From Swiss-Prot:
Family annotation (InterPro entries): Aldolase_TIM, TIM_sf, TrioseP_Isoase_bac/euk, Triosephosphate_isomerase, Triosephosphate_isomerase_AS
Subunit: Homodimer.
Role this protein plays: Involved in the gluconeogenesis. Catalyzes stereospecifically the conversion of dihydroxyacetone phosphate (DHAP) to D-glyceraldehyde-3-phosphate (G3P).
Pathway of action: Carbohydrate biosynthesis; gluconeogenesis; Carbohydrate degradation; glycolysis; D-glyceraldehyde 3-phosphate from glycerone phosphate: step 1/1
Catalytic residue list: 97 (electrophile), 169 (proton acceptor)
Pfam families to which the protein is assigned, alphabetical: TIM
The protein, known as: Triosephosphate isomerase
Sites where the protein binds substrate: 9-11, 175, 214, 235-236
Record family assignment: Belongs to the triosephosphate isomerase family.
Length: 256
């Protein structure tokens, strides 16, 4: 059985005080919780502090990051490399988020290169895909997700997805309070897994597919009860220790 992964994407939120309070609280809330991997992706400036706080709490939390460059060193002002992330113990790296696609004009092909570079450096890509509201209303969701995934598969092979995490995040549900129903999310997750299975059933069987988009303690159980939803990529609710821990506990219970 696939082990669920619940990851918090803190986006552009944080301060020393907030990171300390949040991770201290999360360490306490996760005491004794088993059957789920819990990860956080703080802003880059707080990765060092997060690493220390996670260690103080007994390393119950996986450290991640929100981006990576395509180079490990050199004249690339403002960027951070996989080697730097590894230096701070970060392993799960978010790529392809709709905010990066929109605000930084990151293409499917560029994101596929990031995916491959993370794999080459021994890190776990958390590969975000998803459709806009207009694409959803036009019935294009499955085609959009397939295009985004195939950017990786067609260049690097389906085996590249081994050990990776896919996060399906309908753009219209991110930070809006709207959310896909559990049944609709399951339908898309099943189509993603079927797309991969058509090329390699073993890869499809092991790949983690998270749902993201206004996941909260109140709706988490419904999502995690679906057979192809293997966790969540959580935004706003991950900024509250009790809420985020409740989501993680729901994943552990549903997949036990």
């Amino acid at each position: 059985m696939r082990r669920p992964v619940v990851m918090g994407n803190w986006k552009l939120n944080g301060s020393k005080a907030m990171v300390t309070e949040l991770l201290t609280g999360l360490n306490a809330e996760l005491e004794g919780v088993e059957g789920v991997d819990v990860a956080v992706a703080p802003p880059a400036l707080y990765i060092d502090l997060a690493e220390r706080l996670i260690a103080e709490g007994g390393n119950k939390i996986i450290l991640g990051a929100q981006n990576t460059d395509l180079n490990n060193s050199g004249a690339f002002t403002g960027d951070m490399s996989p080697e730097m992330l590894k230096d701070f113990g970060a392993t799960h790296i978010i790529i392809g988020h709709s905010e990066r696609r929109e605000y930084h004009n990151e293409s499917d092909e560029f994101i596929a290169k990031k995916f491959n570079f993370l794999k080459e450096n021994g890190l776990t890509p958390v590969f975000c895909i998803g459709e806009s509201e207009a694409q959803n209303e036009a019935g294009e969701t499955e085609a959009v997700c397939a295009r985004q995934i195939n950017a990786v598969i067609d260049t690097y092979g389906v085996e590249a997805l081994n050990g990776a995490i896919i996060a399906y995040e309908p753009i219209w549900a991110i930070g809006t309070g709207k959310a896909a129903t559990a049944e609709d999310a399951q339908r898309i997750h099943a189509s993603i897994r079927a797309l991969i299975a058509a090329k390699d059933e073993a890869v499809a069987a092991q790949v983690i597919i998270q749902y993201g988009g206004s996941v909260k303690p109140e709706n988490a159980e419904a999502y995690f009860s679906q057979p192809d939803i293997d966790g969540a990529l959580v935004g706003g609710a991950s900024l509250d220790a009790k809420s985020f821990a409740a989501i993680a506990k729901a994943a552990a219970a549903a997949k036990a």
